């Protein structure tokens, strides 16, 4: 019998493996990306204090998006997260792609955040 691993389970395993080495601090928080089929979510997390410093998602009222599951929405979310981070005085982060491939929406979030002024 041929069995195929669940994609999300494999992603979670990959993310756990990466998270052993990547940690965020108050000075340099972790920019975490979560992607669903309809929306994309970004958080800047201080792992030392276990707090979320900044968050943005395609569900935010500030963005007023009709479709939250495409590359354009991901760019808008990345830009919004970077703007909110810069308002709080955060300019450098550690990028955590959440076990997803660095492609498509995840890449769009990263590039938009870089263009808006975050360094990573």
Swiss-Prot record:
UniProt GO BP: translation
GO molecular function: 5S rRNA binding; structural constituent of ribosome
UniProt-listed SUPFAM superfamilies: Translational machinery components (SSF53137)
This protein's UniProt keywords: Ribonucleoprotein, Ribosomal protein, RNA-binding, rRNA-binding
Pfam families linked: Ribosomal_L18p (PF00861)
UniProt key word Acyltransferase: no
UniProt entry tagged with the keyword Transport: no
Source taxon at top rank: Bacteria
CDD domains xref list: Ribosomal_L18_L5e
Gene3D superfamilies: 3.30.420.100
Function of the protein: This is one of the proteins that bind and probably mediate the attachment of the 5S RNA into the large ribosomal subunit, where it forms part of the central protuberance.
HAMAP family with a match to the protein in the record: Ribosomal_uL18_B
Subunit note: Part of the 50S ribosomal subunit; part of the 5S rRNA/L5/L18/L25 subcomplex. Contacts the 5S and 23S rRNAs.
Name of the protein in question: Large ribosomal subunit protein uL18
Organism name: Exiguobacterium sp. (strain ATCC BAA-1283 / AT1b)
Lineage: Bacteria, Bacillati, Bacillota, Bacilli, Bacillales
């Amino acid at each position: 019998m041929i069995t195929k691993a669940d994609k999300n389970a494999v992603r979670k395993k990959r993310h756990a493996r990466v998270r052993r080495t990547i940690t965020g601090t108050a000075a340099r928080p972790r920019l975490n990306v979560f992607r669903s089929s309809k929306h994309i979510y970004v958080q800047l997390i201080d792992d030392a204090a276990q707090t979320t410093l900044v968050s943005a998602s395609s569900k935010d009222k500030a963005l007023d998006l009709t479709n939250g599951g495409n590359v354009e929405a991901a760019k808008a979310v990345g830009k919004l997260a970077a703007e909110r981070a810069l308002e709080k005085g955060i300019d450098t982060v550690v990028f955590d792609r959440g076990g997803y491939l660095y492609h498509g929406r995840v890449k769009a979030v990263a590039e938009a955040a870089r263009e808006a002024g975050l360094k990573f």
